[in-house]
Swiss-Prot record:
Its EC number(s): 2.7.7.38
SUPFAM superfamilies associated with the record: Nucleotide-diphospho-sugar transferases (SSF53448)
Keyword presence, Hydrolase: no
Family of this protein: Belongs to the KdsB family.
Pfam families xrefs: CTP_transf_3 (PF02348)
Primary localization class, coarse: cytoplasm
Cellular component aspect of the GO annotation: cytosol
Organism of provenance: Syntrophus aciditrophicus (strain SB)
Name listed for the protein in its UniProt record: 3-deoxy-manno-octulosonate cytidylyltransferase
Length: 248
């Protein structure tokens, strides 16, 4: 049976929120919330934060977590994860989960959701989660990455633009957004990092487009849990309110 490990990529630098992984969230650094939620998944046999910053590395070690130092420059979080897993004893068919370091309230059961396709189909290289959009403003917002997929739930394209374009609005359609949790076959991570940057990846600034542009399948799985990614202090305040609401 394949092993499932989870790597949390985390960077200190951010144009909109410098140092956000270490931002205080209800008495803990945000990255600790992510790490502790990962450990609630019974499927995960190992978890670590992959970072290029000593402050994040030391903070993770301080709360008892595992951390892996990586090179400072990587094209994407997936490339950073690929470097991190080189230090682990993994087989080619083992599964590596990527949970973003800015998703402190993701649901641990989503790890089971995103890994299910790879556990059921050994030929799949990667999978990711999608969520049906309910907030109308997200349909046109570039930070909500839209996705279209075929009848077998293989991604056709991801875009910051509104896709699909509905020419005749008499036919209502459901829009889906990408939820940034991935699962990869360990062997595919080697393949992915060896690929050159894709044209669409560069234009949209979406790493998953590299896989699609070079002909690799990405299975999408609909989750019923919305994502709240912290990119600004305002979004951190929103997450804090959500956590405090749960505590009451």
């Amino acid at each position: 049976m394949e092993k499932i490990v989870c790597i949390i990529p985390s960077r200190y630098s951010s144009s909109r929120f410098q140092g956000k992984p270490l931002a205080d969230l209800c008495g803990k650094p945000m990255i600790q919330h992510v790490y502790e939620r990962v450990l609630k998944s019974e499927l995960v046999s190992y978890a670590a934060v992959a970072t290029d910053d000593s402050r994040i590395f030391e903070a993770v070690r301080k709360f008892g977590g595992k951390a892996i130092m990586t090179a400072a420059r990587h094209r994407s979080g997936t490339d950073r994860i690929a470097e991190a897993v080189n230090s682990l004893d993994l087989k080619d068919d083992d599964i590596v989960v990527n949970v973003q370091g800015d998703q402190p309230i993701f649901e641990p059961e989503q790890i089971a959701e995103v890994t299910r396709p790879l556990r059921e189909d050994p030929s799949l290289p990667m999978a990711t989660l999608i969520y049906r959009i309910v907030r109308e403003e997200e349909i046109t917002h570039p930070n909500a990455v839209k996705v279209v997929f075929d009848r077998n739930f293989n991604a056709l394209y991801f875009s910051r633009a509104t896709i699909p374009y509905v020419r005749d609005d008499r036919h209502p359609i459901a829009y889906y957004k990408h939820h940034g949790i991935y699962a990869y076959r360990r062997a595919f991570l080697r393949t992915f990092t060896a690929l050159e940057e894709g044209t669409m990846e560069r234009l949209e600034s979406l790493e998953q487009l590299r896989a699609l542009e070079f002909g690799y399948r990405i299975r999408v799985v609909e989750t019923l849990h919305d994502s709240v990614e912290v990119d600004t202090p305002e979004e951190l305040a929103r997450v804090r309110d959500i956590l405090l609401g749960r505590a009451r």
